[in-house]
Amino acid sequence: KPEEDWGHR
């Protein structure tokens, strides 16, 4: 999900 995806920024 997008919220989890913040870790890649």
Swiss-Prot record:
This is Skin secreted peptide P1-2. It is found in: Secreted. One of its GO terms (cellular component) is extracellular region. It comes from Phasmahyla jandaia (Jandaia leaf frog). Expressed by the skin glands. Keywords: Secreted. Its main location: secreted.
